Structure formats: structure tokens, C-alpha cells
């Protein structure tokens, strides 16, 4: 009996654990502190800094089952998903890694043992082929002489992409970064399937399928193309779980493995589809995986960056559901079946199931409002098309008006063998894209700008003043030996009490001083393992090697500590009041206030806000001890400590406990007891995106200042109303009721005045061919009263044409009324449009009533004078 996908995943991890590897949990799909990546797309992403020598772990061997998304590239990447056997937006990458431990020999032998060992995957050895980089004789010899693969099944692959190291068997992360030769393992499905071995003209067939890539990471590629040896040669491997599952389950398509069979059946059930071979079922089954896990990792549908990629995938799935005949929202209903088929890999998703379902449902409901109209417009445009290409302007209109991502439009067009002018679409999108780039969350890559050898020891939990030594200085990202008065710089110390910005808490400010110099620190940031003090030399000069006294701004740090501790209390309170679906999505803690973004489906009710505020203040009054402990990450999670989904943690973590109320992983600075916070006050609650709410709050002195300001305001209002704060509500209600009554009386007076004005105007009408014509500019009449006056005049005059105008705040308001027996000759919309054009405006409406506006009041008399001639010509 073949293994299930979940069993294959576990067997891989168990095998490498037996070989001394640390089993490391999958990292978030949103790369942590790596602006070069849109999504996590390989198992090695979370170890990038380890390979570069910028980070250290307490293990030298690791194994993972990493969730990956590849959907941010060209549009046809997404279009292929569901239509080929192996294209996916979401997949799991099984990997084993060596950080300067074992190298080629063990990496190759481990792979062979797992694939062919009787107790493991037990694949027939004669079915396996391997490739090596053309000049990698060492790997070739290991395969041939030590493993025993016949030489005719070992293929050397050279630089086949037109440049040095541009080879299928030379792996590189990008234009820069870790790289090296690799060896790949292929499975031969047999001669009943078309295709040839790698390197042959028929290599693109489906007979020989790559199942494992083993990278021998030896170099760090620089921007100028040079290859710098890495500190220690390392190994990075990747094997697609879905691909190896297809091999072990004896099927040729990834969509035929157990996981996808079950998902496809669920898709058919919620959409009402009966043909299980329909490609749309594959599309939706793939897309629910990427969409659900992206939302769980904090990505929200939007029109920018990661959020736009997510929106594209969701809307493509919805459109395929529409093609299958789905009559109601269906996509969100697939989250539960997905959790079931993912096994242990779905545990984190299950924790956020309600939030993920709500976000997907909201997006589906929003798109459903425009999907049918957009498809109708596209169908109309395609039916009129003369050639085989839809113009970019129409594609952009579908995007801008109906929310159609261009790849969804291309999907529809492809079914009719029509292309989309994507260059034209991109041209129309350029302004939006420019704005998106400017507002992008991808900031500067500080580690790329400043490379610091060595580390700084942070001692700021216990000290706010400390002696240290300058180990490096930087100006504009470049290392220097010294800095002088007036220069802005980054100062690296061997040890420091300054907290570097992390986990939402801002960096410390303060002063570095020594013999003959003073350096004002305006911010503190991390640079790899080092801590950088950013600021300006206030006096004197300092150089590398100087002794310094580092003084943190104590009062500012104290306020930050209170706000950070209050954030933890509020997080726990939100989960109690709103539900356990609440998860932190972002935070900002500074010395003035705190801001907390969290997952929730709707605006909080006033009573919920009050309940959270009361609960936090209750914990403050309990004066709970705030304790920290350092422990293994697994032990911390087992103790119930909340970890931020997607946050990057070391193997040893700091657990912050506030009595029995809150336990979280946190590296920030905190109060000693909850009572130190003094008082907690929520100042606002708002939405930042679909499914994400934001609370802003203040503590301590800041909260007292808010209360004092509110009290002063109430006293001022009480004095104005000649009352006191005790009966203020009653006084305000009475004043509002009196105001409403006066407004009602005023409106009645205005209507009476308008009726009288209409009666006066009716005598000024002149007759043209049996039709009364009245044209007049009125003064002191509100624009909204003109319609009432026109109706009155039409009733009084019978067959009539009325044009009234007034000017308020320099703007012209026009209205035209035509009795129904005259509308066959004179249309009110045409008439008012003719007048509006002369006063710099436009308008329109029904044949019997139309209105318009204009900006040129000086042209109004002449415009009104032209009405008689225009009407006479029509009558």
C-alpha cells in the first residue's frame, strides 16, 4: 500500500532526524526581513543569513517541510496552474541542510538511502537518473564510484543558458547571494510516456521528472558577478512533496495524489460540479492552498504587492467556480477540507480557520458584485474583435472598473485563442504602479547596505548605562575609521544597553560619550548580529577602538516599557472578549502611544471596546509580576506561550509571562509589574484592510492627559449649556431637539417663500407657439429649492418650459423642467446641457427634468438669454 502525502512528509523528516538533523518548523510565506523576496519560495529562505555567515544556530544540520508560494512572476505562470501536471501556486518543499557540517559525499549518500532504502521510499534504483554540473568531477565520482549509479545514467550539464554559471546545474538565489553547483535526481516513469533524459532534445517531456535538487553551496555571488567563497561550504536540498508523492503513489500528475483527489472532491461538492476531470476543479484545489495559507500568514487582499497577488489568485478561483456553475459563495468553504487533508502541516491554519474563512468570503462577496457585469463587458468586446488581440485599454478598464486582474482577463481570452495586449495594459497601469511602488512596504535592505563582521551583545534588559568599545563606524553605508562633529553616522559597539528596533518596539535614543566627544543617538537598528546606533556627532570626534559610555534616554525607555507591556495585556484581553481567532498582525510601540493591528471580521462594538479596556485595567490593578524566562522554542510553545505567526525566532526564546493572564514570546523591554502601567485608555478603533482592525491606545501619564482633556471639554460644554457635568446628557439632548425643531420650521418657511416666489414668477412667462417659456436667475434661493419651484411652475403654467438658475459661493446651479406634452420637441437634458456648456459645466437628466452645474457665474446672464432662441428653433 502506497504512503499518503502526510506519511511521506513525516517519513522525510524522520529520516533526517535519524541522521542528526534538527527538525525546524516551516517559516511564514511572508519572508522575514528579506525585501528581495515577495514570498517564501524555497526551503533555504529561512536559512539565508546562516549560509551568508550573518546568523548562527545551535545546530549545524536541519530538515524542514517548507510551505512555498510561487505566483508573483509573469502572468502566464499563473495561467498554467491547473492545466499542467506539475504547476502550482502553493507547494511544500522537503529539504535537508548542512551549515558547514557535511558536504557532497554525505548529502548524496543520504539522498540515495532515503530514495532506495527498503525501510524508506524503496524506489527501484534502475529508475533513477542523476545530473551534475559539467566541471563537478567530485560529485560525478561519488555517484559513480561510491553510490554505484551506472555512468550512462549520470549526465553532465554545462552552461546551457548563454553565460558563465548559467546552467540548470548551477544554482543561484538571484543576481546576488549564495550559489554553487548542484546535482539533480530524476525518476523515469517509463517508455509509455513521451520524453527524454535531461540534456536531450526531448527533456521537456514527462517521462523523466526531477524529484530532488541538491545544491552544494560554496559561493556568495556579488553584484559585479564575482564569486566569493562562503565561510564554510554548505548543502541546501529541495524535493517537492507533491512530486515525490506522485512517484510513490504511482501516478503521473500531481493532481492525482491523495491530497488533491480529496480536495478536488470537496471542490466538486461545494460547486455542484459532476465532471471530476474538469480543469477548473484543479485550479480551485490548487488556489485554496495558496490563498488560505497566505491569509493565515497575514497577507490581506489588496491592490498592492503581496495583497494583489493574493487577490489575483482568489479572483481566478472565483471565476473558475463561476464556470462550474457555483451559485453562491463557495471558496471559503474549502478551508475546512484543506485543513483535513494537510495533516500536521495544517495545524497552524486550523488555529486561524475562522479568520481565514471570513477574509476569503468577504473578498468573494465583493468580487461577485462585479464578476457578471465584467464578464458581460468582456464577452461584448470579444464578440466585436476583428483580430486576435484584446487591446490593453479594455483590459485596464476591466481591472479598474470590475476588479479583473489582467491574468483573469487573459484566462478568458485564452479559451477563445485570443491574446491580451499586456504592454498596453501595463502602460495604462503605470501611474498606479508608480504609486504602489512608493507606498510599498518593502523598505531598504539594511543588511545589504551595511555589512558588519561580528556581533553586539545587548545588555539593555538590566542596564541603561554601560561602558563599551567602538567596533565599527559607517557613513552612508560605507565603513570609516573615524567621524567628527556634525557628521551623521552609524556606530557599532561590542556591547550596548540600547534596544534595536524589533517586534514593533522602536529603537532607543540617548547618548554615547567619551574622552572629548559626544554622539547623539536618534535611533537604534539591527545590522545582522550587530546593533547600530544611528545619530550625529554633537562634539569632538570618535574612532574605531574608542571607549564609550552608552546612556539610554531613561524616561523615554520607561514610557516605551509601559506601552509594550500594555500591548501584551490588550492582546490577551482581545482574545477573551472577541475570540481566539484574534491574532496579532502588526504593532508599533513608542514612548507616546501604542498601535496594535489584529485579525477580526468587523468593527468592534462600543461595549466590546469598553470590555477590553476594563479587562486590561483590571490586570493593571492586580499588579501582576512580569517575569521572563529563556527556554527552547518547542518548550515555550508547549507551555502555552503565544508566538506571532510568521515571526522569526531563534532556537532559544524569551518567554514573557504576566501572572495567569498573558504568556507570549517577546524580546522587547517591559515593566516590572502590571501596576507600573497605571492606566490604559483606548483612543481609537478602525479598519486597515479586510479582516484587520487597528486599536490605538495610551498608558500612564498619556492616559491621564487624555482623561483630563476630556474632563475639561465636558466642563466647557456644561458652561455653554448653563448646566453641570452631571446633567450634561439631558442638556445636550434638549438642545439637539430644539435645533431639530428650528430646522424644521426654517425649512417650512423656505418652502413657503419658494412657493410665493413661484407665484410671482409665473406672471413673467412668455408664450412661444402655444408653450409658456420662463427663464430666470434667482437670488437668495438655495440650489436644492429649485426643483420644488420648477414643479410648482409646471403645475401652474400647463404646457411650459422652465429654466431657473442661482449662484451660491461662485458656483452656478441650473435646472430645466419641460411639461410632458412638450418633451417630444424639447428635451430638458439637452436644454440644460446647452446652458451649462456656456457657464463651464455639464449636466443631464430626464426629458422632463434635468439639472446641471457650472463654474463661470459671469457667463450666466448671456447663457440664459440664449434659451429663448434655442427653444424657438425647437418649437
Swiss-Prot record:
Q: Which GO terms describe its molecular function?
A: alanine-tRNA ligase activity; aminoacyl-tRNA deacylase activity; ATP binding; tRNA binding; zinc ion binding
Top enzyme class of this protein?
ligase
Q: Which cofactor does it need?
A: Zn(2+)
CDD domains xref list: AlaRS_core (cd00673)
EC annotation from Swiss-Prot or TrEMBL: 6.1.1.7
Q: How is the cofactor bound?
A: Binds 1 zinc ion per subunit.
Compartments annotated for it: namely: Cytoplasm
Q: List, in alphabetical order, the GO biological process terms annotated in this UniProt record.
A: alanyl-tRNA aminoacylation; negative regulation of DNA-templated transcription
Query: Under what name is this protein listed?
Result: Alanine--tRNA ligase
Organism, by scientific name, is: Klebsiella pneumoniae subsp. pneumoniae (strain ATCC 700721 / MGH 78578)
What does the record give as the organism's lineage? Bacteria, Pseudomonadati, Pseudomonadota, Gammaproteobacteria, Enterobacterales
* Gene this chain is encoded by: alaS
Amino acid at each position: 500500500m502506497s504512503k499518503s502525502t502526510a506519511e511521506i512528509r513525516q517519513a522525510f523528516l524522520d529520516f533526517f532526524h535519524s541522521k542528526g538533523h534538527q527538525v525546524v518548523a516551516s517559516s511564514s510565506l511572508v519572508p522575514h526581513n528579506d525585501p528581495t523576496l515577495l514570498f517564501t519560495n524555497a526551503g533555504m529562505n529561512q536559512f539565508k543569513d546562516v549560509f551568508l555567515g550573518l546568523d548562527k544556530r545551535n545546530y549545524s544540520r536541519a530538515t524542514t517541510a517548507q510551505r512555498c508560494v510561487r505566483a508573483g512572476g509573469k502572468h502566464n505562470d499563473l495561467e498554467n496552474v491547473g492545466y499542467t501536471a506539475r504547476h502550482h501556486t502553493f507547494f511544500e518543499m522537503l529539504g535537508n541542510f548542512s551549515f558547514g557540517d557535511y558536504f557532497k559525499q554525505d548529502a548524496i549518500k543520504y539522498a540515495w538511502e532515503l530514495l532506495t532504502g527498503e525501510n524508506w521510499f524503496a524506489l527501484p534504483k534502475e529508475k533513477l537518473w542523476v545530473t551534475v554540473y559539467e566541471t563537478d568531477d567530485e560529485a560525478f565520482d561519488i555517484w559513480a564510484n561510491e553510490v554505484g549509479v551506472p555512468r550512462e545514467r549520470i549526465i553532465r550539464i554545462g552552461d546551457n543558458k548563454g553565460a558563465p554559471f548559467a546552467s540548470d546545474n548551477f544554482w543561484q538565489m538571484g543576481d546576488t547571494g549564495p550559489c554553487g553547483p548542484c546535482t539533480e535526481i530524476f525518476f523515469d516513469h517509463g517508455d509509455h510516456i513521451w520524453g527524454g533524459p535531461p540534456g536531450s532534445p526531448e527533456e521537456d517531456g514527462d517521462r523523466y521528472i526531477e524529484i530532488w535538487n541538491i545544491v552544494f553551496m560554496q559561493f556568495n555571488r556579488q553584484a559585479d558577478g564575482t564569486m566569493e567563497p562562503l565561510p564554510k561550504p554548505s548543502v541546501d536540498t529541495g524535493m517537492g512533496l507533491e512530486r515525490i508523492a506522485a512517484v510513490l503513489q504511482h501516478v503521473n500528475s500531481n493532481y492525482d495524489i491523495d491530497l488533491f483527489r480529496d480536495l478536488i472532491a470537496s471542490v466538486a461538492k461545494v460547486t455542484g460540479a459532476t465532471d471530476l476531470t474538469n480543469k477548473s476543479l484543479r485550479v480551485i484545489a490548487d488556489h485554496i492552498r495558496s490563498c488560505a495559507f497566505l491569509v493565515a500568514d497575514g497577507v490581506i487582499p489588496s491592490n498592492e504587492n503581496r495583497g494583489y497577488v493574493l487577490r489575483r489568485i482568489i479572483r481566478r478561483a472565483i471565476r473558475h467556480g463561476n464556470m462550474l456553475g457555483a451559485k453562491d459563495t463557495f471558496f471559503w468553504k474549502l478551508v475546512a477540507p484543506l485543513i483535513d487533508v494537510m495533516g500536521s502541516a495544517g495545524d497552524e491554519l486550523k488555529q486561524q480557520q475562522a479568520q481565514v474563512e471570513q477574509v476569503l468570503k468577504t473578498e468573494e462577496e465583493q468580487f461577485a458584485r462585479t464578476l457578471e457585469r465584467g464578464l458581460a463587458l468582456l464577452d461584448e468586446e470579444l464578440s466585436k474583435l476583428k483580430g486576435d488581440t484584446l487591446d490593453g485599454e479594455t483590459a485596464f478598464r476591466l481591472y479598474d472598473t470590475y476588479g479583473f486582474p489582467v491574468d483573469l482577463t487573459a484566462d478568458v481570452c485564452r479559451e477563445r485563442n485570443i491574446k491580451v495586449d499586456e504592454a498596453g495594459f501595463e502602460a495604462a497601469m503605470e501611474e498606479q504602479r508608480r504609486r504602489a511602488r512608493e507606498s510599498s512596504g518593502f523598505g531598504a535592505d539594511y543588511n545589504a547596505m551595511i555589512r558588519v563582521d561580528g556581533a553586539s551583545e545587548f545588555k539593555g534588559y538590566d542596564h541603561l548605562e554601560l561602558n563599551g568599545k567602538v567596533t565599527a563606524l559607517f557613513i552612508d553605508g560605507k565603513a570609516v575609521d573615524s567621524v567628527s562633529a556634525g557628521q551623521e553616522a552609524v556606530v557599532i559597539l561590542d556591547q550596548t544597553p540600547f534596544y534595536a528596533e524589533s517586534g514593533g518596539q522602536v529603537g532607543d535614543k540617548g547618548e554615547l560619550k567619551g574622552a572629548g566627544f559626544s554622539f547623539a543617538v536618534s535611533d537604534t537598528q539591527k545590522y545582522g548580529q550587530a546593533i547600530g546606533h544611528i545619530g550625529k556627532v554633537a562634539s569632538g570626534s570618535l574612532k574605531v577602538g574608542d571607549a564609550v559610555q552608552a546612556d539610554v534616554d531613561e524616561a523615554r525607555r520607561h514610557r516605551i516599557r509601559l506601552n509594550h507591556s500594555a500591548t501584551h495585556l490588550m492582546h490577551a484581553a482581545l482574545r477573551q472578549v472577541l475570540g481566539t481567532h484574534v491574532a496579532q498582525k502588526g504593532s508599533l510601540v513608542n514612548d507616546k502611544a501604542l498601535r496594535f493591528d489584529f485579525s477580526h471580521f468587523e468593527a468592534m462594538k462600543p461595549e466590546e471596546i469598553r470590555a477590553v479596556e476594563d479587562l486590561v485595567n483590571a490586570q493593571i490593578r492586580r499588579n501582576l509580576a512580569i517575569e521572563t524566562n529563556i527556554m527552547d522554542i518547542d518548550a515555550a510553545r508547549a507551555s502555552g506561550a503565544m508566538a506571532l505567526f510568521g515571526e522569526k525566532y531563534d532556537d532559544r526564546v524569551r518567554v514573557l509571562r504576566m501572572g495567569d493572564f498573558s504568556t507570549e514570546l517577546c524580546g522587547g523591554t517591559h515593566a516590572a509589574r502590571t501596576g507600573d502601567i497605571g492606566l490604559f485608555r483606548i483612543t481609537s478603533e478602525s479598519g486597515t484592510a479586510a479582516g484587520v482592525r487597528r486599536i490605538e491606545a495610551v498608558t500612564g501619564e498619556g492616559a491621564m492627559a487624555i482623561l483630563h482633556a476630556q474632563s475639561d471639554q465636558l466642563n466647557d460644554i456644561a458652561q455653554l449649556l448653563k448646566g453641570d457635568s452631571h446633567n450634561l446628557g439631558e442638556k445636550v439632548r434638549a438642545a439637539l431637539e430644539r435645533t431639530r425643531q428650528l430646522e424644521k420650521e426654517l425649512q417650512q418657511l423656505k418652502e413657503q417663500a419658494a412657493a410665493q416666489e413661484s407665484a410671482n414668477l409665473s406672471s413673467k412667462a412668455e408664450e412661444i407657439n402655444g408653450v409658456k417659456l420662463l427663464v430666470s436667475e434667482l437670488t437668495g434661493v438655495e440650489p436644492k429649492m429649485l426643483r420644488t419651484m420648477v414643479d410648482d411652475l409646471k403645475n401652474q403654467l400647463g404646457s411650459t418650459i422652465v429654466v431657473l438658475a442661482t449662484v451660491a459661493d461662485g458656483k452656478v446651479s441650473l435646472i430645466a423642467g419641460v411639461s410632458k406634452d412638450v418633451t417630444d420637441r424639447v428635451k430638458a437634458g439637452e436644454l440644460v446641457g446647452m446652458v451649462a456648456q456656456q457657464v463651464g459645466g455639464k449636466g443631464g437628466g430626464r426629458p422632463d427634468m434635468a439639472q446641471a452645474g457650472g463654474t463661470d457665474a459671469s457667463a450666466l446672464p448671456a447663457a440664459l438669454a440664449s434659451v429663448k432662441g434655442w427653444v424657438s428653433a425647437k418649437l
